[in-house]
Design a protein with these regions (language model features):
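Terminal accessory/targeting
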Residues: 1-77, 96-106, 111-117, 121-122, ...
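A general structural signal for short secondary-structure junctions and capping/turn motifs
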Residues: 2, 205-208
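Metal-dependent polysaccharide deacetylase catalytic core of the NodB/CE4 family, i.e.
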Residues: 21-38, 54, 69-79, 87-89, ...
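A structural signal for short, well-ordered beta-strand segments and their strand-loop junctions
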Residues: 58-60, 177, 200
Length: 320
């Protein structure tokens, strides 16, 4: 009997170890001017009904973060909902539906817009009012393309933004979401230097117990998001050995990605190119390239055994 209980306990632990939570990222609500980042009230309710009917648990971002931080299990039925920018449409259109379902949120604030009371955005008074229903994080001061900023301007943006965030909210932000989803190691390092504990990307994918808290993937949530496909995504632990950043000469001569998966092949995709089947040796993919990169931002992904790892390369004009 003891052996059976031990075996069952091991099985349950193994299942949780392989589980994947999912973070969804919203922007605008009932705002047809911007279809690529908008979701209608009707569509939002349909998606929330799907979570409810399929037994998903919508949890605070902090619950997922603390589980990863403390080495605790991550559940396959966990869903986290984040809202970027702090548009007024969330306050007026989205929030009532979140409250109707009792779903918590994590709001990432574009500080300059809220502090200066830009017309399309929530004020800090409104953010403080709704804070009791969710969590509030940081989305930069000026919502700039951060990779394109020199060191001084990058640090100034963090210092100004975090200072004004703290002045208005009464605490320093724990979370940070990259503007436009664009980043490199330089931006990431400056964020960490300024006390950021958790960084959210816009690399569509899942989150597992061994995810990096400084690079949590999020799934874009808009009218066209197909929930069954999004919720089926699995996290692939991978080390992107080459290239580390956008190459200075605009050319990727070689790609090397290392995973822990015991697999002989996978599928690699890159912006502007067709998905290709690739070989893996001892969990490593090595791929030669000849063509130069013809755009300032490219997204790459490797899928192995149904799990996906994603990396974005953004041209840094300040790279030495």
């Amino acid at each position: 009997m003891k052996k059976l209980i031990s075996a069952l306990a091991f099985f349950v632990a193994a299942q949780f170890a392989l589980a994947d939570a999912h973070i969804f990222n919203y922007h605008r609500f009932d705002d047809d001017r911007h279809p690529s980042t908008n979701i209608s009230s009707k569509n939002l309710r349909e998606k929330f009904e799907y979570f409810k009917e399929k037994g998903y648990e919508v949890i605070p971002l902090s619950k997922l973060v603390d589980a990863i931080k403390n080495g605790e299990p991550v559940s396959d039925n966990w869903v986290v909902l984040t809202v970027d920018d702090g548009y007024k449409s969330f306050y007026e259109k989205g929030l009532p539906i979140f409250l109707e379902y009792g779903y918590p949120f994590a709001l990432m604030v574009y500080v300059e817009a809220s502090a200066r009371k830009y017309g399309d955005f929530m004020t800090f008074e409104q953010i403080k009012e709704i804070e009791k229903y969710g969590e509030v994080g940081y989305h930069s001061y000026g919502h700039l393309h951060m990779v394109g900023l020199n060191e001084e301007k990058l640090k100034n943006d963090f210092e100004d933004g975090i200072s004004k965030f703290e002045k208005n909210m009464g605490y320093k932000p724990r979370y940070f979401a990259y503007p436009f989803g664009e980043y490199n190691d330089r931006v990431r390092d400056v964020a960490i230097e300024h006390g950021i504990e958790v960084i959210l990307s816009q690399n569509s994918g899942a989150v597992a117990a061994d995810s990096d808290l400084h690079e949590l993937d999020r799934i874009p949530a808009m009218n066209g998001t197909h929930l069954p496909s999004a919720l089926a995504s699995k996290f692939l632990k991978a080390e992107w050995i080459l290239p580390q950043d956008y190459p200075k000469d605009n050319k990727i001569s070689e790609l090397i990605i290392k995973t822990d998966e015991n697999a002989t092949h996978g599928y690699f995709s890159m912006t502007g190119q067709k998905t290709k089947k690739v070989k893996l040796e001892n969990g490593q993919m090595t791929l030669k390239f000849n063509k130069p990169i013809d755009r300032y931002k490219v997204r790459m992904s490797l899928k192995v055994n149904g799990k996906t790892a994603t990396k974005i390369l953004v041209k840094d004009i300040n790279a030495e």
